[in-house]
């Protein structure tokens, strides 16, 4: 079972448009999602990344903008643009939130 580790490859090209294709894979290409609940949790995490709130519940600027995503059994595709933090920090935030779920 995955959820112990999500791996992403380092960016190989700099996007002049600021839009990046990110691929997250399961460790050793293992399953990322075991059931519908796992998929829903991942989508909830994406929503939290694009609609963050402070400790008082007030909205904060988004960490990124997500244009598209595709949840596969053993990997995930995300098309995103940087927001208030660097892409690598956002990808790490997404990965850690799902791993800790």
Model-assigned labels for residue ranges:
Residues 1-101:
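Short catalytic/metal-binding and nucleic-acid-binding patches
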């Amino acid at each position: 079972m995955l959820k112990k580790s999500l791996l992403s490859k380092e960016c190989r090209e700099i996007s002049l448009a600021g839009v990046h294709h990110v691929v997250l894979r399961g460790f050793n290409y293992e399953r990322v999602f075991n059931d519908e609940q796992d998929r829903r949790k991942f989508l909830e995490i994406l929503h939290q990344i694009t609609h963050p709130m402070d400790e008082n519940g007030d909205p904060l600027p988004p960490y990124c903008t997500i244009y598209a995503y595709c949840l596969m059994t053993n990997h995930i595709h995300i098309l995103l643009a940087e927001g208030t933090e660097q892409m690598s920090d956002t990808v790490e935030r997404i990965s850690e939130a799902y791993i800790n779920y």
